[in-house]
Structures are given as structure tokens and as C-alpha cells.
Amino acid sequence: AIDRAVDITWKEKSWMSDNVPAVRLEHVAMPSETAMERAANSDMAWSTQPVFVYAEIESYLKNLTESTVKASYPVAKWLDMGIRTSLSSDAPATSWAAPSDPFVNLKSAVTRKAWDGTDTGQEHRIDIETAIRLYTAEAGPFVGFTDVGILKPGYAADFIILDRDILDIPSDEIDQVKVLETWI
């Protein structure tokens, strides 16, 4: 389905501001090489949820080959190719206990391990700074919000205070981070 959507829309041009993509595709998980090449050369953006393979690894391994599972949600590859990408939780679409918790998805993108430790494609890991950017500064323009996600003059000054420094903890602990305060 993703390949078909890319095939139909990859030549579209943005009709909004310069930073808002012409097309945003959701649930991008396993696109073909052709779809990735077209997306990289288009005004398209992809929103993805590596939390699905993290939370539902048993189903993935039951229905797909191990190599297909490891090739799914290749966020690092997409970024290297120049594909505009954001992360989202897509709550409540996963069976995970707290589907709207962004820290589980951040952990999944950074560690590329499922909840049970299964390797879900180490070559597609991204660092925590990149993962946070894909949830904030990159995600806003995907829906037309071009003044959010960065603390700088002219932008909305919304921010959160966490119970620990997410940039300085072991990646296996990212899902344990808690929000202490939200400032809007």
C-alpha cells in the first residue's frame, strides 16, 4: 500500500508553506527501494512508528521472516537518503500497555530492540538527539505547524521537564523516563 501511495503522489508539490510537505504518509514500515528513492526525490514526508515492532514482536516474527522484521522501519536509512521522516506513537493502535507514551517509541528507534530484547535491526538505529528531533522539530511541519519543536525566538515556547537527562542515560532506560512538568 505504501509503494502504491508513493507511486501515485511522489511528484506532487507543496501547496502550503515551503516547509510543509505536499504529501504525508502514515504507518510507513516496509517500503520498497523504489519507493524510498522516489520519496527521497520528492516533496513527501513519512511518519513512522517503530514502537509497533517493539511491542508486537511475536506477531511480526510469526508472520514475517527475521530479515524482513530487521529491515522494517529503517529510519536511519531513510534519513541518510534524505527522506523527511517523523516519529509518532499512533496511540492507541498498538497493544502496548501505554500506547501514547513517546519514550517507548524513542527507545525502539534508538535501540532497535523489541521489549523482549529481540534484535529488530541494529543497522537502523538512530541516536537519541535525532529521535527527539523527529518527534518535535521535524513532526510539526508535517501537519502545518512551522513554529513548534524548537526553543528559539518566534516559536512556541512549550517544553517539558523530565525526571532525568534523557541525553545522558543508557538507551535501555529511555522508556523509564517520566515527565515531571509540562510548560505551555
List PLM regions with ranges:
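His/Asp/Glu-enriched, well-ordered alpha-helical/loop segment
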Residues: 6-23, 27-28, 33-37, 41-44, ...
